[in-house]
Amino acid sequence: MLFDGTDTDAWVDGKIVENKWLRWGTRTKQHFGDHMFHLEYRTPYMPTAKGMQRGNSGVYVQNIWEIQIVDSFGWNEENRKYERLSIFGQAGGLHEMIGPRINMSFPPLSWQTFDVEFVSARFDEMGNKMKSAMITVYHNGIMIHDRYVIPSFAPGRDPVDERDKGPLYLQDHKNPVVYRNIWLVER
């Protein structure tokens, strides 16, 4: 269990807000390779914000690849006026790579879930990449990515060494997204 509302021992600079929820902008102390995790999140109600400004955050797997968190409930063509990443930027999208198969967002202030299965990239003894990382994501119980093969780079970021394990990072994007019931099982 990484977070059950009682303490932030598993997190770097983790903070509990409203007496029971984990605040955005923290990462796990432990680093992970192959794993499965579950988390619940809640986006704020921001009725005057447009597009990606509505409850924007993200969950970074291995501190590299971002699973988008945003209030995309009711997302429609109107949102494309405000965002260049309007497809990828929906909740559950893999940032700048692929949008979710279906928009499974609940309204803001509702608790939502991500259940994620992640398989790290594989390398031979010489350090040559043999197989890319792969991810499966369920948003609110519905599969939105099925064994998606992740490219060898993280869009918009400096090159990374995929051989390293990494933390789970809950992005600080200056929006008050909160989390609860976070657990992870290494595989």
Where are these regions (language model features)?
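Carbohydrate-interacting regions of secretory-pathway proteins
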Residues: 1-187
